[in-house]
A protein has these predicted regions:
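Surface-exposed loop/interface segments of Gram-negative outer-membrane beta-barrel transport/assembly proteins
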Residues: 1, 36-41, 47, 51-139, ...
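Short strand-turn segments of transmembrane beta-barrel domains in outer membranes
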Residues: 1-15, 28-41
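Structured alpha-helical segments in the cores of large, soluble enzyme domains
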Residues: 12-18, 269-273
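Residue-level signature of outer-membrane beta-barrel architecture
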Residues: 18-20, 31, 54, 144-146, ...
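Short coil-to-beta-strand
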Residues: 21-25
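Periplasmic plug
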Residues: 26-28, 63
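P-loop NTPase catalytic cores that bind/hydrolyze ATP
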Residues: 140, 146, 150-154, 158-159
């Protein structure tokens, strides 16, 4: 059934380190592939990391670090947005008391339709609440240090982050969103939500540091002067689209691939700054 699939998890790791007196480097790669026991749910992630430390001369240093991750998630679970039905409190006892009928549990409810009671095949419910998400994250940081003269050091640092997220949601015929859509013309039809988010961040820091230990010849006192500035630039663009009214035969893969066959019901475009 829903949680009856045989799951497995694969992990692969690779690490390489080395260097000399003036240069040190390290590289690592990690991969995880998780097939969950819940039908339709999977998780996959790849991580890359590179680190480099060098000393080109007696008074200079260069540091560099790069990281990249790619994460893919599949499956939204058999979740419903909200709603309370007279079956909710008794379904948890279905295994213990299987003789209790699920239709028409009390005289106040005269409906004998499982859809009115929010009772669906769990495998169908999982397929009708599907999701496919991919996140990519790239980070790069570097630093340059220069000892201009004894006790006087200049250092500049920079960092760059780039993040993307693409989230596709599908709500099938048994989902709360499809059954209770406000516009009755599109109710009881599959719908999808597409969320695309892109963020960029750049940081730069410049500092100069002077140690007055040669002027203050006292081991009990320390005086340093640090001057510098930092600026950060951040940009973001997020676009969300909801498309409704797909043919009832469309599953998640078909609706995502043929999004033009639906009707656009809402669009959100967010820019910062």
């Amino acid at each position: 059934m829903t949680y009856g699939r045989i799951g497995h998890t694969y992990n692969h790791n690779l690490s390489i380190t080395g260097g000399t007196e003036n240069i040190k480097y390290s590289f690592s790669y990690a991969h995880i592939n998780d097939k969950a026991i819940m039908i339709g749910s999977n998780f996959k992630r790849d991580n890359f990391s590179l680190k480099l430390n060098t000393k080109p001369s007696k008074r200079t240093t260069i540091d560099l670090q790069v990281r990249f991750s790619d994460t893919k998630v599949r499956g939204g679970g058999a979740n419903d947005a909200k709603g309370s039905y007279n079956t909710d409190k008794r379904l948890k006892d279905a295994v213990i008391y299987p003789v209790i009928p699920l239709k028409g549990l009390d005289e106040a409810n005269t409906s004998f339709d499982d859809s009115d009671m929010n009772i669906f095949d769990p495998i169908t419910s999982a397929a009708d609440n599907d999701e496919k998400k991919q996140n990519k994250n790239f980070n790069m940081a570097g630093a340059f240090g220069w000892e201009i003269m004894k006790n006087l050091t200049l250092k500049t640092e920079f960092g760059y982050d780039y993040y993307t997220m693409y989230d596709q949601r599908y709500y099938g015929l048994t989902s709360y969103q499809a059954r209770n859509y406000a516009d009755q013309a599109f109710a009881d039809h599959p719908l999808i939500s597409l969320d695309n988010d892109v963020r960029e961040r750049f940081r730069n820091t410049n500092t100069i540091n002077y140690d007055f230990k040669n002027l203050i010849k006292n081991k009990d006192h320390i005086l340093n002067m640090l001057l510098g500035h930092e600026y950060i630039i951040t940009k973001e663009h997020e676009n969300i689209n909801q498309i409704v009214g797909f043919p009832k035969t469309y599953d998640a893969a078909t609706a995502w691939r043929l999004s033009s066959q639906g009707t656009a019901s809402g669009t959100s475009d967010f820019y910062s700054p």
